[in-house]
């Protein structure tokens, strides 16, 4: 079992080294390599860390990516809970593909165009995915609140998936 973990670590190291060589080959210098969750937290705190509602309150950062979403709960700017949720924009795209009979690429274009035009055509296709995502977020909030004296007061959304038409309203109603 230990060899398996060492092999995973070696593959990850090789993967990172390949990316570093590409970046450095373009004349840029890498100062820091971060994991997704910490990168979102660092970017958020850099931009909003001095705001009173971030410095003194408990907030959640929900980064909705393609394959998965990251949820981070910060209490007075300090990370208290971080987890990956294996639901992302591609799940919505697949539901649209299933509903329309189109291939994944066409469904992705339909999803992107509906986000830009704020069309409601794909609400039914996205509802199940969004309710599952909201359920995972709510479960995380419940766990955090059972371990802490505070509760999440505000959610900040990021990631391409956060641009989906009606997402904020649906998450608000589910959570």
Predicted regions, residues:
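Hydrophobic/aromatic-enriched cytosolic interaction surfaces used to assemble or bind macromolecules
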Residues: 1-175
């Amino acid at each position: 079992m230990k060899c398996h973990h060492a092999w995973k670590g070696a593959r990850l190291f090789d993967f990172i080294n390949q990316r570093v060589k590409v970046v450095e080959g373009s004349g840029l210098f890498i100062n820091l390599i971060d994991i997704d969750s910490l990168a979102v937290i660092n970017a958020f705190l850099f931009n909003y860390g001095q705001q009173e509602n971030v410095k003194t309150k408990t907030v959640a950062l929900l980064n909705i990516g393609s394959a998965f979403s990251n949820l981070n709960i910060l209490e007075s700017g300090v990370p208290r809970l971080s987890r990956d949720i294996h639901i992302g924009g591609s799940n919505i795209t697949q539901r649209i593909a299933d509903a329309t009979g189109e291939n994944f690429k066409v469904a992705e274009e339909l999803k992107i165009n509906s986000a830009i035009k704020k069309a409601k055509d794909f609400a039914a296709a996205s509802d199940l995915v969004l309710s599952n995502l909201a359920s995972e977020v709510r479960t995380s909030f419940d766990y955090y609140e059972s371990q802490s004296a505070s509760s999440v007061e505000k959610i900040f959304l990021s990631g391409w998936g956060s641009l989906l038409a009606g997402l904020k309203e649906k998450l608000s109603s589910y959570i």
